[in-house]
């Protein structure tokens, strides 16, 4: 089946913030001056896969009352992965481009507008009168991104077999097993290499990888 869309993980794939997971969540917590508290929550909740929504709420509560503008000024524009700016326009000529992330919608929305990408699905934080309210917007569960991929494909009129997904971490593996073509980018664990059709450490190689893999699939069909 022909690849019609390329969907990217965001944190560690499109952008590389400071922190163990290059995460937009870490970026916003650190920018708010909450590094110690933020890291403590990460250490507690990351192993507890069934408590991800609780983790989001705990992070959101730490930000309650903090100015959104001041925090976003420190993390936008995002630190794009080398090669992103020159590669996305090339991909855009042939494919629809999207983001599926458990990261923050502030960042995903900025990237889509900045690079001309087409759609995204991401988590978020509630804002009122210019400050964080302490509430979260729960849209993408960290460990079940494959379910959210199906939701996103349905929303965008795509068959998952028409999708190339690009991700970097263990929570991306279920998505990789659900799409027509999976690329592990700068994989953080050997299991991603096993799950993906192909892998690379150079973002600029992605268009050629998609083209070559698509030809191989067409021949096998």
How would you label these PLM feature ranges?
Residues 1-47:
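Active-site neighborhood of HAD-like aspartate-dependent phosphohydrolases
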Residues 62-78, 133-140:
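Glycine-rich phosphate-binding "P-loop"
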Residues 68-105:
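Short, acidic loop-to-helix structural element flanking the phosphoryl-transfer center
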Residues 109-163, 170:
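Substrate-recognition "cap/lid" segment bordering the active-site pocket of phosphatases
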Residues 122-127, 187-191, 204-206:
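Short, acidic/turn-prone active-site loops that include or flank metal/cofactor-
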């Amino acid at each position: 089946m022909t690849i019609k869309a390329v969907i990217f993980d965001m944190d560690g794939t499109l952008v590389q913030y400071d922190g163990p997971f290059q995460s937009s969540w870490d970026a916003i917590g650190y920018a708010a001056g909450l590094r110690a508290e933020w890291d403590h929550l990460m250490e507690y909740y990351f192993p507890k896969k069934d408590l991800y929504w609780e983790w989001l709420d705990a992070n959101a509560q730490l930000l309650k009352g903090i100015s959104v503008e001041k925090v976003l000024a420190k993390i936008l524009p995002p630190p794009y992965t080398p090669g992103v700016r020159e590669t996305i326009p090339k991909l855009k000529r042939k494919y629809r481009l999207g983001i599926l992330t458990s990261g923050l919608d502030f960042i995903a929305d900025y990237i889509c507008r900045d690079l001309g990408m087409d759609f995204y699905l991401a988590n978020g934080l509630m804002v009122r009168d210019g400050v964080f309210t302490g509430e979260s917007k729960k849209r993408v569960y960290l460990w079940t991104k494959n379910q959210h991929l199906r939701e996103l494909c349905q929303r965008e009129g795509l068959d998952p077999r028409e999708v190339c997904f690009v991700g970097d971490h263990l929570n991306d593996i279920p998505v990789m097993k659900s799409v027509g073509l999976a690329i592990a980018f700068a994989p953080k664990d050997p299991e991603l290499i096993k799950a993906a059709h192909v892998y690379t450490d150079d973002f600029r190689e992605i268009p050629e990888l998609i083209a070559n893999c698509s030809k191989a699939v067409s021949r096998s069909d």
